Amino acid sequence: MTATHTHSNGSNDFTPVSINDHVHRRFNPLLGKHVLVSPHRSLRPWNGQKETPAIPVETPHDSKCYLCPGNKRTTGQHNPDYKGIYVFENDFPALLPDPLAVGTNKISDDPLFQSEPVRGRCKVICFHPRHDLTMAAMRISEINHVLDGWKDVYAEEGKIMQEESSDGCVQIFENRGAMMGCSAPHPHGQVWTTSFVPDEPATEIENFVRYASGRSGSHMLLDYALREVKARERVVTLHESGWVAVVPYWAAWPFEILLMPYKRHIPSILQLTAEEQTGLATILKDVLSRYDNLFSCPFPYSMGLHQSPLPPTDPTSNSAQVHFHFYPPLLRSATVRKFMVGFELLGEAQRDIVPEQAAVRLRESLPHKRATLSNDKPYNP
Protein backbone atom coordinates (compact mmCIF):
# COMPACT_ATOMS: atom_id res chain seq x y z
CA MET A 1 0.00 0.00 0.00
CA THR A 2 1.28 3.47 -0.89
CA ALA A 3 1.02 6.06 1.85
CA THR A 4 -0.82 9.35 1.22
CA HIS A 5 -1.22 12.62 3.07
CA THR A 6 -3.43 15.66 2.59
CA HIS A 7 -2.46 18.98 1.05
CA SER A 8 -4.34 22.26 1.42
CA ASN A 9 -4.89 24.35 -1.72
CA GLY A 10 -5.45 27.52 0.31
CA SER A 11 -9.14 26.95 0.91
CA ASN A 12 -10.79 24.55 3.26
CA ASP A 13 -10.41 21.74 0.72
CA PHE A 14 -7.77 19.11 1.34
CA THR A 15 -6.74 16.76 -1.43
CA PRO A 16 -4.85 13.50 -0.91
CA VAL A 17 -1.29 13.52 -2.25
CA SER A 18 0.75 10.36 -2.72
CA ILE A 19 4.00 10.21 -0.81
CA ASN A 20 5.51 8.98 -4.08
CA ASP A 21 5.40 12.58 -5.31
CA HIS A 22 7.62 13.83 -2.48
CA VAL A 23 11.00 13.10 -0.92
CA HIS A 24 10.65 10.43 1.76
CA ARG A 25 12.43 7.53 3.46
CA ARG A 26 11.46 3.89 3.37
CA PHE A 27 12.47 1.21 5.86
CA ASN A 28 13.93 -2.18 4.96
CA PRO A 29 12.77 -4.58 7.70
CA LEU A 30 15.02 -7.36 6.41
CA LEU A 31 18.21 -5.45 7.15
CA GLY A 32 16.99 -2.71 9.50
CA LYS A 33 18.15 0.03 7.12
CA HIS A 34 16.51 2.97 5.34
CA VAL A 35 16.53 4.20 1.75
CA LEU A 36 16.03 7.84 0.78
CA VAL A 37 13.56 8.22 -2.12
CA SER A 38 13.86 11.38 -4.26
CA PRO A 39 11.29 11.15 -7.11
CA HIS A 40 11.98 14.65 -8.49
CA ARG A 41 15.57 13.67 -9.40
CA SER A 42 14.28 11.45 -12.21
CA LEU A 43 13.98 14.60 -14.33
CA ARG A 44 17.59 15.74 -13.96
CA PRO A 45 19.75 15.71 -17.12
CA TRP A 46 22.60 13.20 -17.30
CA ASN A 47 26.03 14.25 -18.58
CA GLY A 48 27.98 11.75 -16.56
CA GLN A 49 29.71 8.50 -17.41
CA LYS A 50 28.14 6.22 -19.98
CA GLU A 51 29.00 2.56 -20.24
CA THR A 52 29.60 0.59 -23.39
CA PRO A 53 26.39 -1.40 -23.92
CA ALA A 54 26.75 -5.14 -23.55
CA ILE A 55 26.59 -7.13 -26.77
CA PRO A 56 24.76 -10.48 -26.84
CA VAL A 57 27.07 -13.48 -27.13
CA GLU A 58 26.34 -15.39 -30.34
CA THR A 59 29.01 -18.12 -30.28
CA PRO A 60 27.81 -21.53 -29.00
CA HIS A 61 31.39 -22.53 -28.19
CA ASP A 62 34.39 -20.26 -27.62
CA SER A 63 37.78 -21.96 -27.82
CA LYS A 64 39.26 -19.25 -25.56
CA CYS A 65 36.62 -19.56 -22.83
CA TYR A 66 37.82 -21.19 -19.60
CA LEU A 67 34.33 -22.57 -18.93
CA CYS A 68 33.35 -24.13 -22.26
CA PRO A 69 33.38 -27.95 -22.52
CA GLY A 70 36.75 -29.48 -23.41
CA ASN A 71 38.68 -26.24 -22.97
CA LYS A 72 41.83 -25.73 -20.93
CA ARG A 73 41.58 -23.61 -17.79
CA THR A 74 44.33 -21.33 -16.45
CA THR A 75 45.49 -24.09 -14.08
CA GLY A 76 46.18 -26.41 -17.00
CA GLN A 77 43.21 -28.64 -16.25
CA HIS A 78 40.77 -29.45 -19.03
CA ASN A 79 37.01 -29.25 -18.63
CA PRO A 80 35.19 -32.47 -19.46
CA ASP A 81 32.87 -32.58 -22.45
CA TYR A 82 29.92 -31.90 -20.17
CA LYS A 83 26.37 -31.96 -21.53
CA GLY A 84 24.38 -30.46 -18.66
CA ILE A 85 25.57 -28.46 -15.66
CA TYR A 86 29.19 -28.67 -14.56
CA VAL A 87 30.44 -28.02 -11.02
CA PHE A 88 34.12 -27.67 -10.12
CA GLU A 89 36.37 -26.14 -7.47
CA ASN A 90 37.12 -22.48 -8.16
CA ASP A 91 40.67 -22.12 -9.48
CA PHE A 92 41.09 -18.85 -7.54
CA PRO A 93 39.04 -19.31 -4.35
CA ALA A 94 38.41 -16.57 -1.82
CA LEU A 95 38.29 -19.20 0.95
CA LEU A 96 40.48 -22.20 1.75
CA PRO A 97 39.51 -25.49 3.46
CA ASP A 98 42.32 -25.29 6.03
CA PRO A 99 43.77 -21.77 6.24
CA LEU A 100 46.74 -21.13 8.50
CA ALA A 101 45.59 -19.48 11.71
CA VAL A 102 47.43 -16.27 12.53
CA GLY A 103 48.52 -16.28 16.17
CA THR A 104 45.55 -17.99 17.76
CA ASN A 105 42.26 -19.64 16.94
CA LYS A 106 40.53 -17.49 19.53
CA ILE A 107 38.93 -14.15 18.80
CA SER A 108 40.98 -11.30 20.24
CA ASP A 109 39.79 -9.79 23.50
CA ASP A 110 40.71 -6.35 22.20
CA PRO A 111 37.47 -4.75 20.92
CA LEU A 112 39.40 -2.66 18.39
CA PHE A 113 41.43 -5.45 16.79
CA GLN A 114 39.25 -8.52 16.53
CA SER A 115 39.91 -11.30 14.05
CA GLU A 116 39.40 -15.01 13.70
CA PRO A 117 40.53 -17.64 11.20
CA VAL A 118 37.86 -18.90 8.82
CA ARG A 119 37.68 -21.73 6.34
CA GLY A 120 35.52 -22.64 3.42
CA ARG A 121 35.30 -23.73 -0.19
CA CYS A 122 34.42 -21.98 -3.43
CA LYS A 123 32.84 -23.72 -6.40
CA VAL A 124 31.80 -22.69 -9.89
CA ILE A 125 28.64 -24.06 -11.49
CA CYS A 126 28.28 -23.80 -15.27
CA PHE A 127 24.59 -23.59 -16.10
CA HIS A 128 24.85 -24.99 -19.62
CA PRO A 129 27.51 -26.20 -22.08
CA ARG A 130 26.52 -23.53 -24.61
CA HIS A 131 28.57 -20.36 -24.34
CA ASP A 132 25.72 -18.19 -25.65
CA LEU A 133 22.81 -19.57 -23.67
CA THR A 134 21.78 -17.39 -20.73
CA MET A 135 19.18 -18.54 -18.23
CA ALA A 136 16.62 -16.25 -19.87
CA ALA A 137 17.00 -18.22 -23.11
CA MET A 138 17.05 -21.70 -21.61
CA ARG A 139 14.14 -24.11 -21.65
CA ILE A 140 12.27 -24.54 -18.36
CA SER A 141 13.64 -28.09 -18.13
CA GLU A 142 17.20 -26.75 -18.45
CA ILE A 143 16.65 -24.20 -15.68
CA ASN A 144 15.25 -27.04 -13.59
CA HIS A 145 18.60 -28.82 -14.05
CA VAL A 146 20.35 -25.70 -12.72
CA LEU A 147 18.04 -25.76 -9.69
CA ASP A 148 18.86 -29.44 -9.18
CA GLY A 149 22.54 -28.52 -9.28
CA TRP A 150 22.03 -25.81 -6.67
CA LYS A 151 20.17 -28.26 -4.45
CA ASP A 152 22.89 -30.90 -4.76
CA VAL A 153 25.74 -28.49 -4.00
CA TYR A 154 23.81 -26.91 -1.11
CA ALA A 155 23.12 -30.35 0.40
CA GLU A 156 26.65 -31.68 -0.13
CA GLU A 157 28.52 -28.58 1.05
CA GLY A 158 26.11 -28.10 3.92
CA LYS A 159 26.62 -31.66 5.13
CA ILE A 160 30.40 -31.24 5.09
CA MET A 161 30.19 -27.99 7.05
CA GLN A 162 27.73 -29.46 9.56
CA GLU A 163 30.14 -32.32 10.21
CA GLU A 164 32.97 -29.86 10.84
CA SER A 165 31.15 -27.15 12.77
CA SER A 166 27.80 -26.13 14.22
CA ASP A 167 27.89 -22.90 12.24
CA GLY A 168 28.34 -22.01 8.60
CA CYS A 169 26.63 -20.99 5.38
CA VAL A 170 26.32 -22.09 1.76
CA GLN A 171 25.86 -18.97 -0.37
CA ILE A 172 24.71 -19.42 -3.99
CA PHE A 173 24.99 -16.43 -6.32
CA GLU A 174 25.51 -15.24 -9.89
CA ASN A 175 27.22 -12.14 -11.28
CA ARG A 176 26.15 -11.42 -14.83
CA GLY A 177 27.95 -8.99 -17.11
CA ALA A 178 31.27 -7.16 -17.09
CA MET A 179 29.58 -4.26 -15.30
CA MET A 180 29.16 -6.57 -12.28
CA GLY A 181 32.74 -7.82 -12.43
CA CYS A 182 31.97 -11.06 -14.23
CA SER A 183 35.16 -12.24 -15.93
CA ALA A 184 33.55 -14.83 -18.24
CA PRO A 185 30.37 -14.44 -20.33
CA HIS A 186 29.70 -18.18 -20.25
CA PRO A 187 26.51 -18.70 -18.16
CA HIS A 188 27.64 -19.68 -14.68
CA GLY A 189 27.28 -18.95 -11.00
CA GLN A 190 29.25 -19.55 -7.82
CA VAL A 191 28.81 -21.29 -4.49
CA TRP A 192 30.83 -20.14 -1.49
CA THR A 193 30.70 -22.26 1.66
CA THR A 194 31.84 -20.44 4.80
CA SER A 195 32.50 -21.51 8.38
CA PHE A 196 30.47 -18.50 9.51
CA VAL A 197 27.14 -16.91 8.57
CA PRO A 198 27.85 -13.70 6.57
CA ASP A 199 26.39 -10.42 7.77
CA GLU A 200 23.52 -10.05 5.25
CA PRO A 201 21.81 -13.43 5.78
CA ALA A 202 22.60 -13.34 9.50
CA THR A 203 20.90 -9.94 9.87
CA GLU A 204 17.88 -11.12 7.88
CA ILE A 205 17.40 -14.18 10.07
CA GLU A 206 17.79 -12.12 13.26
CA ASN A 207 15.03 -9.81 12.03
CA PHE A 208 12.84 -12.77 11.01
CA VAL A 209 13.12 -14.16 14.54
CA ARG A 210 12.40 -10.76 16.10
CA TYR A 211 9.35 -10.26 13.86
CA ALA A 212 7.96 -13.73 14.60
CA SER A 213 8.40 -13.38 18.37
CA GLY A 214 5.94 -10.50 18.46
CA ARG A 215 3.41 -11.99 16.06
CA SER A 216 2.67 -15.51 17.26
CA GLY A 217 5.34 -17.04 15.05
CA SER A 218 4.24 -15.56 11.71
CA HIS A 219 7.00 -15.12 9.12
CA MET A 220 7.99 -11.64 7.96
CA LEU A 221 8.60 -12.52 4.31
CA LEU A 222 5.46 -14.61 4.02
CA ASP A 223 3.35 -11.81 5.51
CA TYR A 224 5.06 -9.31 3.21
CA ALA A 225 4.60 -11.47 0.10
CA LEU A 226 0.89 -11.92 0.79
CA ARG A 227 0.40 -8.17 1.17
CA GLU A 228 2.28 -7.47 -2.04
CA VAL A 229 0.17 -10.03 -3.92
CA LYS A 230 -2.96 -8.36 -2.58
CA ALA A 231 -1.82 -4.81 -3.42
CA ARG A 232 -0.26 -5.69 -6.82
CA GLU A 233 1.32 -2.25 -7.34
CA ARG A 234 4.91 -3.51 -6.95
CA VAL A 235 4.35 -7.00 -8.39
CA VAL A 236 6.37 -7.66 -11.55
CA THR A 237 5.18 -11.20 -12.20
CA LEU A 238 3.50 -14.01 -10.29
CA HIS A 239 3.28 -17.78 -10.73
CA GLU A 240 0.37 -19.86 -9.50
CA SER A 241 2.70 -22.45 -7.94
CA GLY A 242 3.36 -19.91 -5.20
CA TRP A 243 6.08 -17.49 -6.36
CA VAL A 244 5.93 -13.72 -6.68
CA ALA A 245 8.56 -11.26 -7.96
CA VAL A 246 8.29 -7.68 -6.73
CA VAL A 247 10.28 -4.49 -6.77
CA PRO A 248 10.44 -4.35 -2.97
CA TYR A 249 8.95 -1.36 -1.18
CA TRP A 250 12.43 -0.57 0.20
CA ALA A 251 14.42 -1.26 -3.00
CA ALA A 252 17.76 0.57 -3.18
CA TRP A 253 18.72 -0.34 -6.75
CA PRO A 254 16.55 1.11 -9.57
CA PHE A 255 15.16 -2.19 -10.88
CA GLU A 256 15.87 -4.40 -7.89
CA ILE A 257 13.69 -7.51 -7.58
CA LEU A 258 12.82 -9.72 -4.63
CA LEU A 259 11.55 -13.18 -5.63
CA MET A 260 9.86 -15.18 -2.88
CA PRO A 261 7.15 -17.74 -2.05
CA TYR A 262 3.73 -16.40 -1.09
CA LYS A 263 1.80 -19.55 -0.19
CA ARG A 264 3.82 -21.25 2.55
CA HIS A 265 6.96 -21.27 4.67
CA ILE A 266 9.90 -22.83 2.76
CA PRO A 267 13.22 -22.60 4.65
CA SER A 268 15.41 -23.89 1.80
CA ILE A 269 15.29 -25.14 -1.79
CA LEU A 270 15.50 -28.70 -0.45
CA GLN A 271 11.90 -28.37 0.75
CA LEU A 272 10.48 -27.41 -2.67
CA THR A 273 7.83 -29.65 -4.17
CA ALA A 274 8.22 -30.66 -7.82
CA GLU A 275 5.48 -28.17 -8.73
CA GLU A 276 7.15 -25.36 -6.77
CA GLN A 277 10.53 -26.06 -8.37
CA THR A 278 9.10 -25.98 -11.90
CA GLY A 279 7.25 -22.80 -10.97
CA LEU A 280 10.52 -21.31 -9.72
CA ALA A 281 12.26 -22.22 -12.98
CA THR A 282 9.40 -20.61 -14.91
CA ILE A 283 9.38 -17.35 -12.97
CA LEU A 284 13.20 -17.10 -13.07
CA LYS A 285 13.04 -17.26 -16.87
CA ASP A 286 10.23 -14.68 -16.80
CA VAL A 287 12.14 -12.22 -14.59
CA LEU A 288 15.41 -12.51 -16.52
CA SER A 289 13.64 -12.14 -19.87
CA ARG A 290 11.95 -8.95 -18.64
CA TYR A 291 15.33 -7.62 -17.56
CA ASP A 292 16.86 -8.29 -21.00
CA ASN A 293 13.88 -6.69 -22.72
CA LEU A 294 13.82 -3.55 -20.54
CA PHE A 295 16.71 -1.82 -22.32
CA SER A 296 17.09 -4.36 -25.16
CA CYS A 297 20.45 -5.58 -23.89
CA PRO A 298 21.99 -8.44 -21.90
CA PHE A 299 20.96 -7.06 -18.50
CA PRO A 300 23.74 -7.06 -15.86
CA TYR A 301 22.96 -8.01 -12.27
CA SER A 302 24.10 -9.71 -9.12
CA MET A 303 21.65 -12.37 -8.00
CA GLY A 304 21.76 -14.42 -4.84
CA LEU A 305 19.73 -17.02 -2.99
CA HIS A 306 19.06 -16.55 0.71
CA GLN A 307 17.72 -19.52 2.65
CA SER A 308 18.63 -21.49 5.75
CA PRO A 309 22.43 -20.98 5.93
CA LEU A 310 22.87 -24.75 6.18
CA PRO A 311 20.36 -27.50 5.25
CA PRO A 312 17.69 -27.42 7.98
CA THR A 313 17.53 -30.40 10.33
CA ASP A 314 13.97 -29.43 11.30
CA PRO A 315 12.33 -27.41 8.51
CA THR A 316 9.17 -26.73 10.54
CA SER A 317 11.04 -24.77 13.21
CA ASN A 318 13.58 -23.09 10.93
CA SER A 319 13.39 -19.27 10.91
CA ALA A 320 14.67 -18.78 7.35
CA GLN A 321 12.51 -18.29 4.25
CA VAL A 322 13.94 -19.02 0.82
CA HIS A 323 14.11 -15.95 -1.44
CA PHE A 324 16.18 -14.44 -4.26
CA HIS A 325 17.66 -10.94 -4.45
CA PHE A 326 18.38 -9.36 -7.84
CA TYR A 327 20.57 -6.23 -7.77
CA PRO A 328 20.97 -4.72 -11.28
CA PRO A 329 22.96 -1.48 -11.72
CA LEU A 330 21.29 0.00 -14.83
CA LEU A 331 19.35 3.20 -14.22
CA ARG A 332 18.10 4.92 -17.38
CA SER A 333 19.36 2.90 -20.32
CA ALA A 334 21.82 0.20 -21.35
CA THR A 335 24.63 2.77 -20.96
CA VAL A 336 23.68 4.68 -17.79
CA ARG A 337 24.22 2.92 -14.49
CA LYS A 338 23.60 3.85 -10.87
CA PHE A 339 26.62 4.52 -8.68
CA MET A 340 26.44 3.88 -4.94
CA VAL A 341 28.71 6.77 -3.90
CA GLY A 342 28.85 9.89 -1.73
CA PHE A 343 25.83 10.12 0.55
CA GLU A 344 25.03 6.47 -0.11
CA LEU A 345 28.40 5.34 1.21
CA LEU A 346 28.48 7.84 4.07
CA GLY A 347 24.77 8.12 4.90
CA GLU A 348 22.23 5.68 3.48
CA ALA A 349 20.99 4.33 0.15
CA GLN A 350 19.12 6.72 -2.16
CA ARG A 351 17.00 6.17 -5.26
CA ASP A 352 15.22 8.40 -7.80
CA ILE A 353 12.54 6.36 -9.58
CA VAL A 354 10.06 5.05 -7.03
CA PRO A 355 9.71 1.26 -6.77
CA GLU A 356 6.11 1.42 -7.98
CA GLN A 357 7.19 3.06 -11.26
CA ALA A 358 10.02 0.56 -11.69
CA ALA A 359 7.52 -2.28 -11.25
CA VAL A 360 5.26 -0.80 -13.95
CA ARG A 361 8.17 -0.63 -16.40
CA LEU A 362 9.14 -4.23 -15.69
CA ARG A 363 5.54 -5.40 -16.03
CA GLU A 364 5.38 -3.69 -19.42
CA SER A 365 8.68 -5.31 -20.42
CA LEU A 366 6.91 -8.44 -21.63
CA PRO A 367 9.20 -11.49 -21.60
CA HIS A 368 7.87 -12.91 -24.88
CA LYS A 369 8.40 -9.73 -26.94
CA ARG A 370 12.17 -10.04 -27.30
CA ALA A 371 13.46 -12.88 -29.45
CA THR A 372 15.62 -15.22 -27.40
CA LEU A 373 18.64 -17.10 -28.65
CA SER A 374 17.95 -20.17 -30.74
CA ASN A 375 18.15 -22.84 -28.06
CA ASP A 376 16.25 -25.51 -29.95
CA LYS A 377 19.34 -26.68 -31.82
CA PRO A 378 21.48 -29.47 -30.33
CA TYR A 379 24.81 -28.44 -28.85
CA ASN A 380 27.63 -29.25 -31.28
CA PRO A 381 30.97 -27.53 -30.54
Curated annotation (Swiss-Prot):
The active site is at residue 188. Its cofactor is Zn(2+). It comes from the Eukaryota. Binds 1 zinc ion per subunit. Zinc binding seems to play a structural role. Pathway: Carbohydrate metabolism; galactose metabolism. One of its GO terms (biological process) is galactose catabolic process via UDP-galactose, Leloir pathway. Gene3D superfamilies: HIT-like. It holds the Pfam family GalP_UDP_transf. It catalyses: alpha-D-galactose 1-phosphate + UDP-alpha-D-glucose = alpha-D-glucose 1-phosphate + UDP-alpha-D-galactose. GO terms for cellular component: cytoplasm. Its EC number is 2.7.7.12. UDP-alpha-D-glucose binds at residues 90-91, 175, 190, 338-341, 343-344. The keyword Metal-binding applies. Zn(2+) binds at residues 65, 68, 131, 186. GO terms for molecular function: UDP-glucose:hexose-1-phosphate uridylyltransferase activity; zinc ion binding. Fe cation binds at residues 204, 306, 323, 325. Keywords: Carbohydrate metabolism, Galactose metabolism, Iron, Metal-binding, Nucleotidyltransferase, Transferase, Zinc. PANTHER family: GALACTOSE-1-PHOSPHATE URIDYLYLTRANSFERASE (PTHR11943:SF1). Homodimer. Belongs to the galactose-1-phosphate uridylyltransferase type 1 family. This is Galactose-1-phosphate uridylyltransferase. The gene is GAL7.
